């Protein structure tokens, strides 16, 4: 049976790890390379590294930080933020990323997913979907850090990008992000059921039970969290042990 993955997320702005509430009011949570190294040592299954200002401020992802992180971390590293072209994917893979995540660029041009997947393989192409609830059972994609509405249905878009070749969906509930009220389980389940690739649930973890719910109720293949780990509320080990106690297969060190 495939093990469920636990993924700490390092949101980076101006070279530092930050964790905001609903992408506003950022708090400094440390140096990204140090944080990644600590999570590697703590038993994280993967690390997700997102430059949250790259798209908004229209600058490329910080390749040097990726390179330094990859040199010191030996778990898979997913990198996103400001990724626009297959050349960006190539540069990040060369810098040491294992997977590269498209977000706003894929919404503007879903074919960029196909171009990147054709060249590098679906296994290293992630599509990040940031969505908000707009009506019962309906979720809409927002881009540029949640600042721009698109009118695009999140479930339909997930089907489209996986058909184009995305090997994984990183699904963030913008309504829940930073609130510690738990994942949007209905949305997570709807998208998990709609696609045949792994879905990473993101946005809203406040307790260890929320991680369990993402898998058992949301159908996610992996769960992502930031602030509960960054500020020492729980360790990766505690989270994994709690998930195992609830019948979820996890990798322990």
From Swiss-Prot:
Molecular-function GO term, any one: imidazoleglycerol-phosphate synthase activity
A GO cellular component annotation in the UniProt record: cytoplasm
GO biological process: L-histidine biosynthetic process
Record-annotated disulphide pairs: none
EC identifiers of the protein: 4.3.2.10
Main location: cytoplasm
Domain of life where this protein originates: Bacteria
Reactions this protein catalyses: 5-[(5-phospho-1-deoxy-D-ribulos-1-ylimino)methylamino]-1-(5-phospho-beta-D-ribosyl)imidazole-4-carboxamide + L-glutamine = D-erythro-1-(imidazol-4-yl)glycerol 3-phosphate + 5-amino-1-(5-phospho-beta-D-ribosyl)imidazole-4-carboxamide + L-glutamate + H(+)
Active site: 11, 130
Location of the protein in the cell: Cytoplasm
Keywords, alphabetical: Amino-acid biosynthesis, Cytoplasm, Histidine biosynthesis, Lyase
Pathway given in the UniProt record: Amino-acid biosynthesis; L-histidine biosynthesis; L-histidine from 5-phospho-alpha-D-ribose 1-diphosphate: step 5/9
SUPFAM superfamilies: Ribulose-phoshate binding barrel (SSF51366)
Pfam families, sorted: His_biosynth (PF00977)
Role: IGPS catalyzes the conversion of PRFAR and glutamine to IGP, AICAR and glutamate. The HisF subunit catalyzes the cyclization activity that produces IGP and AICAR from PRFAR using the ammonia provided by the HisH subunit.
Family, as annotated: Belongs to the HisA/HisF family.
PANTHER family membership: IMIDAZOLE GLYCEROL PHOSPHATE SYNTHASE HISHF, IMIDAZOLE GLYCEROL PHOSPHATE SYNTHASE SUBUNIT HISF/H IGP SYNTHASE SUBUNIT HISF/H
Subunit structure: Heterodimer of HisH and HisF.
Protein name per the record: Imidazole glycerol phosphate synthase subunit HisF
Taxonomic source organism: Ruegeria sp. (strain TM1040) (Silicibacter sp.)
Gene that this sequence comes from: hisF
């Amino acid at each position: 049976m495939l093990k469920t993955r636990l993924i700490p997320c390092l949101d980076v702005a101006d070279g530092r790890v930050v964790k905001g509430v609903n992408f506003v009011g950022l708090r400094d949570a440390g140096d990204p390379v140090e944080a990644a190294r600590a999570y590697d040592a703590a038993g994280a299954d993967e690390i997700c590294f997102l430059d949250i200002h790259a798209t908004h401020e229209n600058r490329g992802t910080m390749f040097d930080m990726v390179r330094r992180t990859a040199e010191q971390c030996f778990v898979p590293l997913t990198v996103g933020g400001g990724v626009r072209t297959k050349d960006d994917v190539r540069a990040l893979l060369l810098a040491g990323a294992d997977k590269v995540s498209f977000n706003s660029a894929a919404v503007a041009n879903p074919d960029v997913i196909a171009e990147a997947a054709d060249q590098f393989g679906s296994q290293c192409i992630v599509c990040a979907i940031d969505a908000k609830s707009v009506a019962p059972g309906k979720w809409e994609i927002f881009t540029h850090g949640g600042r721009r509405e698109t009118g695009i249905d999140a479930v339909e878009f997930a089907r489209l990008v996986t058909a184009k070749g995305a090997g994984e969906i990183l699904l963030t509930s913008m309504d829940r992000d930073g609130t510690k009220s738990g994942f949007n389980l209905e949305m997570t389940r709807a998208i998990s059921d709609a696609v045949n690739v792994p879905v990473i649930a993101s946005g809203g973890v406040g307790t260890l039970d929320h991680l369990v719910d993402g898998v058992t109720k949301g159908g996610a293949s992996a769960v992502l969290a930031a602030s509960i780990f960054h500020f020492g509320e729980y360790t990766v080990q505690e989270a994994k042990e709690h998930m195992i106690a609830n019948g979820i297969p996890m990798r322990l060190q």
